[in-house]
Regions:
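Conserved RNA-binding domains used in RNP assembly and mRNA/RNA metabolism
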Residues: 2-134
């Protein structure tokens, strides 16, 4: 575990816009480069939602936040295993308000336990149809 990353994460406030440098998992063959091809550097930028996970802690970054009329969000997120983190850079503290950050966290924690109204299911069908056109 990178103790510097843990220290950086513990000082973050939910709602801050951050960049996380990390190394992704990789697949390869021993004849295709061996040890030099193992590290896959990645950086992700998003709104810090929290450090979550039952077994292993993950840095949760929200990228796209779809707000519905009832104040619940559907969130596109990246979950980066804490142990894969290399560096964290704060771009802007409290990029969104504390209240909105709390709404994002609450929506994230609701997960699949919430059913969306039929009108949103229709919207989802339209979005899926659009994806097939690409």
């Amino acid at each position: 575990l990178n103790k510097q990353v843990l220290k950086q994460i513990k000082s973050l406030k939910p709602g801050s816009l951050i960049r996380v440098d990390w190394h992704d998992a990789s697949i390869g063959k021993s004849l295709s480069g061996g040890r030099t091809g193992i590290d896959v550097p990645v950086f992700s930028i998003g709104i810090f939602i929290g450090l979550l996970g039952e077994n292993d802690k993950h840095i949760i970054l929200g990228q796209n936040h779809f707000r519905y009329a009832d104040g619940i969000f559907d969130i596109d997120y990246t979950a980066i295993p804490l142990v894969w983190g290399v560096n964290v850079k704060v771009i802007q503290v409290e990029y969104i308000s504390r209240e909105e950050a709390q709404q994002l966290l609450n929506s994230f924690l609701l997960g699949g336990r919430r059913t969306l109204p039929k009108r949103l299911k229709r919207q989802e069908r339209l979005r899926n149809h659009h994806d097939r056109l690409d």
